[in-house]
Regions:
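Conserved short S/T/G-enriched processing/targeting/catalytic segments and their helical context
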Residues: 1-105, 127-130
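Conserved phosphate-donor
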Residues: 100-123
Length: 130
């Protein structure tokens, strides 16, 4: 089981995670890739299937976060309209997000995302909470 911890304060965010992975047969291994990464100014902590975070770590550059936002609603707009669609496009291109036509988009990971000192929890259906 993965543990990702994130704390948001006034003008700062800190995030940490364990470094163990468990295979389906219960063997435990120490991971070579971290569960918390910095991708183009976006801090991403991942849990669930390791493939999702691997894809965000290798071969993908996150959209650059906006430098100045006046309201958190503007940051929510960036998450909804820029970051999440770019992430999903990468997952689809790499075969990680595959769905039948009559189903909703889904992956098998959960992410904690820190951008501009604001934390988001991104669920497997691409919905988020702040």
């Amino acid at each position: 089981m993965t543990t990702v911890v994130a704390i948001q304060g006034p003008g700062w965010v800190v995030m940490a995670a364990d470094s163990q992975s468990t295979y389906w047969d219960s063997r435990k291994v120490l991971m070579s890739n971290g569960k918390v990464i910095n991708n183009n100014g976006v801090l991403i902590g991942g849990a669930g299937q390791g493939r999702g975070l691997d894809l965000l770590q290798r071969g993908w550059v996150a959209p650059k976060p906006p430098k100045r936002v006046k309201t958190v609603d503007q940051l929510d707009d960036w998450m909804s309209k820029i970051f999440i669609p770019a992430m999903r496009d990468h997952f689809v291109e790499q075969g990680y997000d595959m769905k039948p036509d009559d189903s909703f988009a889904k992956h098998e990971s959960a992410f904690v995302i820190a951008v501009n000192n604001t934390l988001y929890l991104l669920d497997e259906d691409y919905s988020y909470d702040r």
